[in-house]
């Protein structure tokens, strides 16, 4: 599932391409046809994200998108390709130089037209987002510090923390040497502060680079140049391989419906 940095980057790109201009909105698949007709030809005011949610404001009407596991935006310049497959929503605009821009949405869990009040209802149910400068990590810690639930599960709860998914969960816990099985109430305030600060750095880097890289250069096989795909993570999808730090075999098991990855030595309970 795309994590928060992906939605933040998408919102920024769509803001640059479409905001302040009239947008031709269609739904070739038909599932968004009625809403698309209401929006077609209107000016897109703003595109923002919060956690794993994207919001595109056309005046008081807001397109809300949650990509889920299989959703994906594709985009380009010039004339868009002929519609094919389950194309839920298409935007077309003039672009900055008039050559034309487009973006297509397929496979999203949610693609709805909602009100500003409904946007606020969604936001009120989410925890702080490490990519939002005004987010308050104390709000998340207040819930974590009272919970018997393992921290590895709490980090995946969007009501606790917005935007973190399976990759960031595994990697930030490893980087902070925290066991994913430690109850939330046993995580100290200092440990939480360090984890939050690390998430802010990692997720901002994810926005900038367009991918998740969590390893330090000194811990990679190839230490020069950009991180290779196989060097990008410490534990995520490295089950059966040796820990980059201590040499212990990386393990995996399911937690809250997703595969968890950790080093039993570096992240001892």
What do the predicted segments below correspond to?
Residues 1-269:
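Structured catalytic/nucleic-acid-binding cores of DNA maintenance enzymes
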